[in-house]
Design a protein with these regions (language model features):
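A short, small-residue-rich loop immediately preceding and capping a beta-strand
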Residues: 93-115
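ATP/NTP phosphate-donor binding region
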Residues: 1-99
Length: 115
Protein backbone atom coordinates (compact mmCIF):
# COMPACT_ATOMS: atom_id res chain seq x y z
CA UNK A 1 0.00 0.00 0.00
CA UNK A 2 1.20 3.48 -0.81
CA UNK A 3 0.08 6.69 0.88
CA UNK A 4 -0.34 10.09 -0.71
CA UNK A 5 -0.52 13.19 1.47
CA UNK A 6 -2.75 15.92 0.07
CA UNK A 7 -2.01 19.41 1.39
CA UNK A 8 -4.62 22.05 0.63
CA UNK A 9 -5.04 25.53 2.09
CA UNK A 10 -6.65 25.02 5.47
CA UNK A 11 -6.64 21.22 5.50
CA UNK A 12 -4.66 18.14 4.67
CA UNK A 13 -5.48 14.46 4.44
CA UNK A 14 -4.00 11.13 3.48
CA UNK A 15 -5.10 8.87 0.63
CA UNK A 16 -4.14 5.19 0.79
CA UNK A 17 -3.67 3.54 -2.60
CA UNK A 18 -3.35 -0.15 -3.27
CA UNK A 19 -4.99 -3.41 -4.22
CA UNK A 20 -7.09 -5.38 -1.72
CA UNK A 21 -6.32 -2.96 1.14
CA UNK A 22 -9.79 -2.63 2.66
CA UNK A 23 -9.00 -5.21 5.34
CA UNK A 24 -6.03 -3.12 6.42
CA UNK A 25 -7.64 0.31 6.11
CA UNK A 26 -11.08 -0.21 7.68
CA UNK A 27 -9.83 -1.06 11.19
CA UNK A 28 -7.61 2.06 11.02
CA UNK A 29 -10.60 4.21 10.04
CA UNK A 30 -12.60 2.91 13.01
CA UNK A 31 -9.63 3.38 15.34
CA UNK A 32 -9.13 6.98 14.15
CA UNK A 33 -12.85 7.81 14.47
CA UNK A 34 -13.89 6.50 17.88
CA UNK A 35 -17.37 5.04 17.58
CA UNK A 36 -19.29 2.01 18.71
CA UNK A 37 -21.50 1.86 15.60
CA UNK A 38 -20.57 1.67 11.92
CA UNK A 39 -23.30 2.04 9.30
CA UNK A 40 -22.38 0.70 5.87
CA UNK A 41 -24.36 1.99 2.89
CA UNK A 42 -24.02 -0.15 -0.22
CA UNK A 43 -26.05 -1.33 -3.19
CA UNK A 44 -27.50 -4.66 -4.23
CA UNK A 45 -24.71 -5.39 -6.72
CA UNK A 46 -21.87 -4.81 -4.24
CA UNK A 47 -23.76 -6.74 -1.56
CA UNK A 48 -23.93 -9.77 -3.87
CA UNK A 49 -20.22 -9.53 -4.75
CA UNK A 50 -18.97 -8.98 -1.19
CA UNK A 51 -21.56 -10.35 1.26
CA UNK A 52 -20.60 -9.62 4.86
CA UNK A 53 -17.14 -8.37 3.81
CA UNK A 54 -17.12 -5.31 6.06
CA UNK A 55 -18.70 -7.29 8.91
CA UNK A 56 -15.87 -9.83 8.65
CA UNK A 57 -13.16 -7.14 8.50
CA UNK A 58 -14.52 -5.28 11.54
CA UNK A 59 -15.55 -8.28 13.65
CA UNK A 60 -12.62 -7.78 16.05
CA UNK A 61 -12.97 -4.00 16.28
CA UNK A 62 -15.64 -4.11 18.97
CA UNK A 63 -18.18 -2.10 16.98
CA UNK A 64 -21.75 -2.80 15.95
CA UNK A 65 -21.99 -2.92 12.14
CA UNK A 66 -25.30 -2.22 10.39
CA UNK A 67 -25.74 -2.47 6.63
CA UNK A 68 -28.18 -0.40 4.57
CA UNK A 69 -28.56 -1.86 1.08
CA UNK A 70 -30.16 0.29 -1.61
CA UNK A 71 -30.94 -0.53 -5.25
CA UNK A 72 -28.16 -0.10 -7.79
CA UNK A 73 -28.17 2.63 -10.39
CA UNK A 74 -28.21 6.35 -11.04
CA UNK A 75 -32.03 6.36 -10.99
CA UNK A 76 -31.90 5.74 -7.24
CA UNK A 77 -29.94 8.89 -6.45
CA UNK A 78 -33.07 10.69 -5.27
CA UNK A 79 -34.96 11.91 -2.21
CA UNK A 80 -36.92 8.66 -1.87
CA UNK A 81 -33.72 6.64 -1.47
CA UNK A 82 -32.33 9.27 0.88
CA UNK A 83 -35.50 9.01 2.96
CA UNK A 84 -35.03 5.22 3.14
CA UNK A 85 -31.48 5.75 4.41
CA UNK A 86 -32.75 8.19 7.05
CA UNK A 87 -35.41 5.68 8.14
CA UNK A 88 -32.75 2.97 8.36
CA UNK A 89 -30.50 5.22 10.46
CA UNK A 90 -33.35 5.89 12.89
CA UNK A 91 -34.28 2.19 13.07
CA UNK A 92 -30.73 1.14 14.02
CA UNK A 93 -30.41 4.05 16.50
CA UNK A 94 -27.53 5.71 14.65
CA UNK A 95 -26.36 8.94 16.24
CA UNK A 96 -23.81 11.71 15.72
CA UNK A 97 -20.98 9.43 16.79
CA UNK A 98 -21.95 6.69 14.32
CA UNK A 99 -19.54 6.27 11.43
CA UNK A 100 -21.05 5.94 7.95
CA UNK A 101 -19.07 4.10 5.29
CA UNK A 102 -20.01 4.27 1.61
CA UNK A 103 -19.14 0.87 0.13
CA UNK A 104 -19.59 1.26 -3.61
CA UNK A 105 -19.19 3.69 -6.46
CA UNK A 106 -20.43 7.14 -7.36
CA UNK A 107 -24.11 6.91 -6.45
CA UNK A 108 -23.32 5.27 -3.11
CA UNK A 109 -20.64 7.84 -2.30
CA UNK A 110 -22.85 10.76 -3.30
CA UNK A 111 -25.96 9.69 -1.42
CA UNK A 112 -24.07 8.53 1.69
CA UNK A 113 -22.16 11.80 1.80
CA UNK A 114 -25.40 13.74 1.49
CA UNK A 115 -27.05 11.68 4.25
Amino acid sequence: MESLNVNLPGREYKIDIGFDILGECLPQVVQNNPTDHVVVVTNTTIEKLYPNYIFDVLQNSGVLVSSCVIPDGEDYKNLETLSKIFDFLMNVCANRESLMIAFGGGVIGDITGFA
